Amino acid sequence: MPTEFLYTSKIAAISWAATGGRQQRVYFQDLNGKIREAQRGGDNPWTGGSSQNVIGEAKLFSPLAAVTWKSAQGIQIRVYCVNKDNILSEFVYDGSKWITGQLGSVGVKVGSNSKLAALQWGGSESAPPNIRVYYQKSNGSGSSIHEYVWSGKWTAGASFGSTVPGTGIGATAIGPGRLRIYYQATDNKIREHCWDSNSWYVGGFSASASAGVSIAAISWGSTPNIRVYWQKGREELYEAAYGGSWNTPGQIKDASRPTPSLPDTFIAANSSGNIDISVFFQASGVSLQQWQWISGKGWSIGAVVPTGTPAGW
C-alpha cells in the first residue's frame, strides 16, 4: 500500500511513564516535509501519523530530535529540526497544543547534511529543564559537534570531536549534568564524549562501523545503564550495552520474523528502563517499524507505526 512516509526520513522518538502504561511518541516527515506525530499508550495500538497529526514543517530530509518531561502544565515535548534556510528550529508542545518555539529566532546555522540529537535533565513539575541540542556547523570531514544550550534562554555551548561528514549523533543524560554523546569519528569508529558537571572528555566507548551510520542512545538508572544503537547495513542493527562496563556489540535479530530495513535507514530509540526498549527504523516497503525489547522475552519485531496513506487508498 502506498505511504506518505518520506523515503529515508529521519526519525525521533520519546516516551514517558504514565498511569495507563508507557506513552510513546514518534516523529517523522511526510512527502511534503511536514513533521507528523504517531502515538501509542500502553499496549494499545499505534494511532496518528496522518495528515491530521502534523506538528510543523521543516526542509525535506531534515534531521529530527525530541525531548520530553512532565511539568505543572502537563507533558512537555520539544521537537528539533532544520528549516529550509538550514536554521535550527523548534516545535513546542506546551501541555495542550503545538506552537513554534524560540530557538528558530536565534538564527543558529546548521550544516546542510548535519544530523541532530537532543537531551534534557531536571525538568519536573517544580523545576525547568536543562536542554542540549547537538549539531554540526559544517559539512567537511573533521568538523566538530556543536552544542546549543537551554537553561532559561538559548546560548551557544561547547564544541568537540572530529567527525565524518554528516555524522549520526546520539545523546543521553545519565544523571543531572552527566551527559554522553556518541558520533562517528574520522576513522569511522563510533566514539563517546562525556560531560560530568565540569568538563568534556573522551569516553571509553569505541565501536567499528561502516561510514555514514545512524546512531541513537538511551540510558536509565543510577548505575547507569546505557544502550547505543547503530545501523550497519541491510538487516544489521547493532547494540552496545553499558552497565558498569561496555559489552561486545551484538546484532539485534528475530529469526522468526526477519524484517529487512532499508540499507540507509535512520533510527531512533526510546525506553522505559530495561523493561521495554523500542528502536524505530524504516523497513523495506517504506514502512515505519520497531524492534522491541521486553524483559524476559528479548528482541522481536513490534507493530508497524502508522504513517498515513495517500487520498483514494
From Swiss-Prot:
UniProt record similarity statement: Belongs to the fungal fucose-specific lectin family.
Gene source species: Aleuria aurantia
Positions bound to beta-L-fucose 2: 78, 90, 102, 154
Effect seen on changing residue 7 to R: Impairs homodimerization
Gene3D superfamilies, per the entry: Fucose-specific lectin
Residues reported in the UniProt entry to bind alpha-L-fucose 1: 78, 90, 102, 154
Reported uses of this protein in biotechnology and industry: AAL's binding activity could be used to identify secreted fucosylated glycoproteins that may represent candidate biomarkers for cancer since fucosylation of N-linked glycans has been associated with several types of cancer such as liver cancer. Identified as one of the several suitable fluorescently labeled lectins that can be used in a combination for the visualization and quantification of extracellular glycoconjugates in dental supragingival biofilms grown for 48 hours in situ in the absence of dietary carbohydrates.
UniProt-reported outcome of changing residue 284 to D: Impairs homodimerization
Residues given in the record as beta-L-fucose 3 binding sites: 132, 147, 200
Domains (record comment): AAL adopts the six-bladed beta-propeller fold and contains 5 binding sites per monomer, each located between two adjacent blades. Residues conserved at 5 of the 6 sites, are located on the surface of the AAL and directly contribute to fucose recognition. Because the corresponding residues forming site 6 are not conserved, this site cannot be considered to accommodate fucose molecules. The 5 binding sites that are non-equivalent, and owing to minor differences in amino-acid composition they exhibit a marked difference in specific ligand recognition.
Name by which UniProt lists this protein: Fucose-specific lectin
Residues that coordinate or bind beta-L-fucose 4: 227, 239, 299
Single GO molecular function: carbohydrate binding
Biological processes per GO annotation: defense response to fungus; reproductive fruiting body development
Start and stop residues of the Sequence repeats: 5-57, 58-109, 110-162, 163-208, 209-260, 261-304
